[in-house]
Amino acid sequence: MARVVPLDSASEAAATLSGVRAQLATVWLGAGGVLDLLLITVLAGGHVLLEDVPGVGKTTLAKGLARVLGVAFNRVQFTSDLLPADVLGGSVYHPGDGRFEFVAGPIFTDLLLADEINRAPTRSQSAFLQAMEEGQVTADGVSHPLSPLFTVIATQNPIDFDSTNPLPEAQLDRFLIATRLGYPDAAAERSLLGEYRSAPPLLPMLDPAGLLRLREQARGVFLHPDLAHYIVALARATRDDPRVRLGISPRGAIHLADAARARALLHGRSVVQAEDVRALLHPVWDHRLLPRQGREHDRRITAALLDELTAGVPLPR
């Protein structure tokens, strides 16, 4: 029988996460919902895709998240000449003693910013995303495990598609959440020009062991069978409509359940509620749904279609 998180433990976790969020808010002046989605991704042990234009704070946010969580951070700029070994690492031959040594690449970290992932060659994308999914890098028949905290924040520009290789549907499905940061409001943008630059340095609110405990707590949040049936019904509603080329996969349903558990813990609850599922429907599923008509990368089209497809699924009583 699965261990359920006690209510007092959930409240303590929420208090800790509130401190993390408050620290991040000193360097991120945009919508607060983005911070929640990043924390949900980390708690659920998933990966996030940020689809946004340059200059809106993606790198600052990723570095800040790693700092506040107390985990290691690396950044890789994906380019058209990037090789798999540039990210994963590989074996180096030492002629002096005739041996090979594995040299770890930047993927061997806790939090990795994969910047402009759609600019890399498809071979490099595939190798990276396979390692991301499997949690290990295999070289010369030897598997090298990644960090148990390994989390990817990948970015791609939704406007500039010249010389890019859009991620295939099967690879998009590996991201727990896809979202956009958006531009800050006028007041926040004015702050960027002034007092924001003198903000105090971020303080670590967690360490790797503490973050692992929070992930374990998130897995222990109770999902009622009725809500599990509801998630399955939502996913199945996307699969048999003539307007849909590709509906939500079983992995997408699992990801929604995992994210809902993480959101419940973020709000200090030991039980998932229907509002957790509904609040995460678009961040978890919009990038997985592929309509037959319209531009594949236009999330407005997929969001509207997802609303229509799931509107008739009754909430559990």
What residues fall within each predicted segment?
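Pre-Walker A (pre-P-loop) alpha-helix and adjacent loop at the N terminus of AAA/AAA+ ATPase modules
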Residues: 10-53
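Conserved AAA+ ATPase small/helical "lid" subdomain
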Residues: 203-256
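C-terminal engagement/docking regions of AAA+ P-loop ATPases
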Residues: 2-7, 240-317
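AAA+/P-loop NTPase substrate/partner-engagement loops
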Residues: 68-96
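Canonical AAA+ ATPase core
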Residues: 94-99, 116-124, 132-208, 212-221, ...
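Walker A/P-loop
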Residues: 39-79
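P-loop (Walker A) phosphate-binding loop of NTP-binding proteins
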Residues: 53, 87, 155
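Walker B catalytic acidic pair
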Residues: 52, 115-116, 127
